[in-house]
């Protein structure tokens, strides 16, 4: 309910408790760059971790660290927590929650090397529902927007030899967004974080995948939209009648040009749309619709499995794009 209000209308009573899903040790409390955005990591043992992102307030068992956390980018902690104990509060935005199981690798990631330099935990992302009791699981499922299986969604859509999945710009070393040449010529240790000359590490990222809720729709998401330094954006990738879907686009398909359009939604029958300005989640079971046209993108899977693309936001007609130009990029 708090997300239906503007930030200026929120009171302390609107913030809800963030509690531990199981016994464990809080090993990290990080400030994500603003006074109301924190990351918390809980180690539950047996290589199982739960991670909370963009948490608003540090409270409960972490209250004594609140002041220190607000002034520090990263705190390594050792705070025991019991299932159900509060360690934070949430009110101004949705809370990210993930479970990582270090014993299980997501089978839909085709490029393990890409995750060695940053977000090394991502390939271990787990479906968290089976870890909860039937009572809690039922309550959680009742709030999930996606009504089809898997209810928590999917991030590993890599299909070798097709355009589907997660990609990284050729010449870069995966998720961290650093150039291979930096590693080849390094004389000191290269860390993660900011990339020299770029606005964000995601400048080199690309994803072409089904929408996280309405999997009939395809999404084109690029860390480099118009600015080669990085200006992440995404749009609906519109598969026209007679066109092959990205998961069926192979080297034999040649170059295929798709329209891009603004992503929007329509609620299920009988459910009202969110009011303008609302931060509340879109309604459960919504479907994707497209808005204004945002250009075209040409895709071509190469014989070596790499992907060539060219994004053109100045034209909206598929027939207006006939061949790659010097603006073509290649991803692995």
Which ranges hold each PLM region?
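Short glycine/threonine/proline-enriched tight-turn/helix- or strand-capping micro-motif at secondary-structure
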Residues: 1-20, 29, 143-154, 181-205, ...
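N-terminal glycine/threonine-rich, aromatic-flanked beta-hairpin/loop signature
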Residues: 177-254
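Zn2+-dependent peptidoglycan hydrolase active-site motif and core
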Residues: 21-73, 95
């Amino acid at each position: 309910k708090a997300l239906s209000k503007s930030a200026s209308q929120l009171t302390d009573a609107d913030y809800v408790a963030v509690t531990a899903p199981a016994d464990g040790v809080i090993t990290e409390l990080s400030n994500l760059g603003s006074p109301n955005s924190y990351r918390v990591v809980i180690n539950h043992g047996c290589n199982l971790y739960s991670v909370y992102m963009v948490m608003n307030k540090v409270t409960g068992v972490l209250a004594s660290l609140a002041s220190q956390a607000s002034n520090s980018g990263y705190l390594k902690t050792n705070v025991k927590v019991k299932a159900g104990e509060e360690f934070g509060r949430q009110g101004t935005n949705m809370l990210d929650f993930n479970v990582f199981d270090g014993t299980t690798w997501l089978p839909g990631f085709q490029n393990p090397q890409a995750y060695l330099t940053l977000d090394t935990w991502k390939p271990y992302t787990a479906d968290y529902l089976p870890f909860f009791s039937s009572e809690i699981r039922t309550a959680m499922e009742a709030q999930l927007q996606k009504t089809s299986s898997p209810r928590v969604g999917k991030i590993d859509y890599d299909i070798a030899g097709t355009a589907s999945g997660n990609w990284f710009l050729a010449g870069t070393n995966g998720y961290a967004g650093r150039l291979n040449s930096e590693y080849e010529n390094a004389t000191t240790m290269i860390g993660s974080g900011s990339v020299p000359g770029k606005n964000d590490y995601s400048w080199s990222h690309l994803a072409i995948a089904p929408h996280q809720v309405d999997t009939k729709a395809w999404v084109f998401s690029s860390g480099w939209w118009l600015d080669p330094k990085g200006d992440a954006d995404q749009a609906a990738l519109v598969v026209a009648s007679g066109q092959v879907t990205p998961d069926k686009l192979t080297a034999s398909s040649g170059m295929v040009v798709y329209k891009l359009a603004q992503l929007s939604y329509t609620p299920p029958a009988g459910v009202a749309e969110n009011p303008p300005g609302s931060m509340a989640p879109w309604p459960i079971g919504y479907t994707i619709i497209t808005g204004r046209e945002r250009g075209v993108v040409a895709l071509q899977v190469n014989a070596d499995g790499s992907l060539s693309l060219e994004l053109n936001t100045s034209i909206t007609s598929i027939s207006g794009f006939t061949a790659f130009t010097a603006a073509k990029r290649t991803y692995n």
